[in-house]
Amino acid sequence: MAVAAAAAAGPVFWRRLLGLLPGRPGLAALLGRLSDRLGRNRDRQRRRSPWLLLAPLLSPAVPQVTSPPCCLCPEGVHRFQWIRNLVPEFGVSSSHVRVLSSPAESFELMKGQIRVAKRRVVMASLYLGTGPLEQELVDCLESTLEKSLQAKFPSNLKVSILLDFTRGSRGRKNSRTMLLPLPQRFPEQVRVSLFHTPHLRGLLRLLIPERFNETIGLQHIKVYLFDNSVILSGANLSDSYFTNRQDRYVFLQDCAEIADFFTELVDAVGDVSLQLQGDDTVQVVDGMVHPYKGDRTEYCKAANKRVMDVINSARTRQQMLHAQTFHSNSLLTQEDAAAAGDRRPAPDTWIYPLIQMKPFEIQIDEIVTETLLTEAERGAKVYLTTGYFNLTQAYMDLVLGTRAEYQILLASPEVNGFFGAKGVVGAIPAAYVHIERQFYSEVCSLGQQERVQLQEYWRRGWTFHAKGLWLYLAGSSLPCLTLIGSPNFGYRSVHRDLEAQIAIVTENEALQQQLHQEQEQLYLRSGVVSSATFEQPSRQVKLWVKMVTPLIKNFF
């Protein structure tokens, strides 16, 4: 509360605080964005304030330590170091980071990692499909669990799966029925958690049809973890995502600290979710408020505490680890370290987990993304991609109002996941075309066509679901930062769903080249949007769709 009181004291507080940050443009921009947000929200009576996110900056949870020298703040990427004031910073060698290029590669890697897992398998997704490929994945899990029991020295293998309740319960055959044999056969080793948004309750829950109740809010995090290795992606566990639905994937191999963090994060969300039982019923964790039957405010407060405890404790651990590493390096020469057998390569890549759970008043990803867009200077290039082009007003204003060059990749109607669907849902691609045309018109009216360019992805027989961004600093032909994970940069991602992605910051040229090639391969399958694009027959939007889109755009 002291933070909010200090912020309310007025501009003098901010001048003094920003004066303490020479040479920290990122953090200064972050505080500036938050100051603007407080001004907009000050008159709203809200139980919790996003200003609480500033607490780690003003009242650190751990003692202040001397910042390491340039080994942790390399030239050119040091400007992103401010992110660690909000989330844990994980320094790794770029040799442990691999960008995957195709759905098939991701699927085969996932199965291979499950087969050799000894300690833990943690999988968070929107849903698990019901086809033969999804069954193959379940069979892999079952086989690995069986082997763990039959081994000469039985392992402590644990499997934790987190899905969305509404999406995972749709239809008679669904994610729950696919997974049910696992908790039935291995009740001591398997946990299946189903997150239910606290905003779908009461009469609303009774009236909204099954296919549409997902619009209120979802568990949208996609993390696939095997022992100490992690796949971060935007892809769900469904056949199209294993074959012909284009997404992004990064494999973090033997990164124990990152694996520990995401295990704890999934456990935290699992604790505030419903637990699947062997008889296909669900139960609340003992002592937890029910997500849609209990008091919503109390539930959200408990969920906020559970998740923020994970983030803050990991941040504290990493700060202490950085301090110890810095102290040890100052005492030991490289020869001493080699003689002692420490052959670990120095970190040249930094991973920052960015969490967005607005229902729980956690908006770290939003703050970091807005600050990155704010700081992108003249000459910098931002490649931003989303499968569902529906930017929030804040992101749109930053794209149109800052100086960096933007190339925005989005799905053409034919590769939109809803293309050809029956009923009202089939009009969703047209709604996205309408939103795209409105944005393009605004770009043109501002004379920004050279600086902000739209491109549409098209690939015969495929759909498009990739999201994220690549940041190229001014004068550089390779990206030094990428965001990869579940957020789509739209209203849902920011306000309704549970999201997670990572910021990868690297000074390693080989990894930068991997990221650059990933970006190029996606954009090579696209065409530049012009006024002629919207004259095509496939871009004609019916009047009723134009009228309805402003009313429903916040739900997709």
Swiss-Prot record:
Residue numbers bearing the Phosphoserine modification: 49
Boundaries of every PLD phosphodiesterase domain copy: 215-241, 460-493
Presequence range in chain numbering: 1-28
Annotated localization: Mitochondrion
Activity modulation: Activated by calcium and magnesium and inhibited by other bivalent cations.
GO aspect biological process, one term: cardiolipin biosynthetic process
Catalytic function, reaction form: a CDP-1,2-diacyl-sn-glycerol + sn-glycerol 3-phosphate = a 1,2-diacyl-sn-glycero-3-phospho-(1'-sn-glycero-3'-phosphate) + CMP + H(+)
Active site residues per record: 220, 222, 227
Gene Ontology CC entries for this record: mitochondrion
Major site of localization recorded for this protein: mitochondrion
Pathway this chain belongs to: Phospholipid metabolism; phosphatidylglycerol biosynthesis; phosphatidylglycerol from CDP-diacylglycerol: step 1/2
Keyword Membrane in record: no
Binding-site residues, ATP: 124-131
Single annotated GO MF: ATP binding
PANTHER family the record matches: CDP-DIACYLGLYCEROL--GLYCEROL-3-PHOSPHATE 3-PHOSPHATIDYLTRANSFERASE, MITOCHONDRIAL, CDP-DIACYLGLYCEROL--SERINE O-PHOSPHATIDYLTRANSFERASE
Role, per record: Functions in the biosynthesis of the anionic phospholipids phosphatidylglycerol and cardiolipin.
Family named by the database record: Belongs to the CDP-alcohol phosphatidyltransferase class-II family.
Protein name, UniProt field: CDP-diacylglycerol--glycerol-3-phosphate 3-phosphatidyltransferase, mitochondrial
